[in-house]
């Protein structure tokens, strides 16, 4: 497959595109799968070096046979930029060696999936699942257009034609013609047919989907250094912007030495924003140096100023036990109160999860250039929600969205943080103020201390068991800041529990919170799965078999659990000083289960994970190697979060500032073996980017419980916390 050096493409006006393409073009809506004429103002990023009509908004086939497929998803290392075109190319029956991939234009009405209401968002591990059916349909429609044109040219029935990779075949006359040749004369039908699902490819005939030889399109450029991230952007006349932001969210700035700062050589301007003071200078070094010289007085009336982590946990503990306090019901069925009264034994426990920072590798950045007359603008950024970023920039600049062109770039990590648009808005505000192209950069300290964290939360669980020791009553109350961010993962669709109540009691501390990889599934599945093991341990039941009973009505989940137990050799005799733990979780439609083997240094409190086994049902696997890498990555990020990561808030301000006091997992901590297996499935693809993270934390906690008889109920499991648990009476 041919590869371009950069993921972005020049935007063209509709008029220029039509003239260059030499034919008509239309858009295939990903959400409705209907042809739509591209309206004036839309700017398809299509290459114009060869004439020939665009078969659809998703693909451009040139007379020489080259095929450009347009990818609407952000590429941040998760592989969507290869996976989505693979799906389209499968139904198109394209020769993959002739395929090249470019980012699609930022046109959500055309490229927005149904999964997010038509928005171009790459979040929640739903790029592949969100586009799968629509891209198969669009690819099949493009194939139909090619075959229909050949049928008319050769005057043969369409039903007599078939395809091979990038070729239309008429077996009766032994004729064949390449897609490139067809593109040179093809015309578009007035209306595209809806291809019946049964006429799409049978999965057993897939050549590209599931093919382990299909390599990631972006990898060569990332290895040789030619891949372009937004942080690499340089444009003529560009200046640099940095911002001194409030250490406490909601505090307002007053700059006390503005005139002094403006007199410094190289300073273009200082700009007052609602949440900070921006410095624009001719070099980044100058901007950073001057930023350190700002004398800012911050207002003291911010809501977050009264918030501290430890006080919050005390507040949550009181809140979850208050019988008069009612929160938002997430799920309720049966008669919980009577079930608890009738229970043979009732268990209860409380779990805690600290704030977490996204820690994406590439610092936040964006470039915004306003036209000299202020009538239009260009934006360069890496974003998980480029349509939102485009709209946000337009709003700050006072422009209609059609007057803003956004060039998407690779992202050096996202994890949910880059689905927000604050860094693009800041760059736009500085560019508007100085009327020059501005490159805004966040330092690591900026990002960590003014971050949008995974919310702090506390979970209270109460469960009753019957005479056989099986759970039949379940009460779960979550309290913390972040509201909906805490709700995901609280429900248990694969466990059969007749009487249950799940409730969210949210508190607003005025903090900035955001989706973090796996969102609420991380803290919620930790609490749920650890609590289940505590009950099984007290009942002297095998935790694997205990879960099998809970899953008795869900064969898909059982298959995953049984698979991982077999992989790990569950029940085998372990070496002295070793223990195993097991846990189950579903994220983004993918049931997954993990087993880990640990050891414990009782003198230092350090837990060492030696082996991890993971089984996941991700439906049809589009890219096997990348799917495995994604699952491994989520497992390792999960390990990092459960052993090291914690943001502590005191009087509204983060007490950590960089990786010296916010450590993350290092190579020396990676397990000796990490085995991932995908359960064979004919289900449509489901999410894999976060599948491993929710179950690895409780698997470790459960192994610790099996080894020591003690429960770990506060993430992260630092040596200090482990020693405290071991020493507790």
Language-model-derived ranges and their functions:
Residues 2-729:
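Cofactor-binding beta-sheet edge motifs in enzyme active sites
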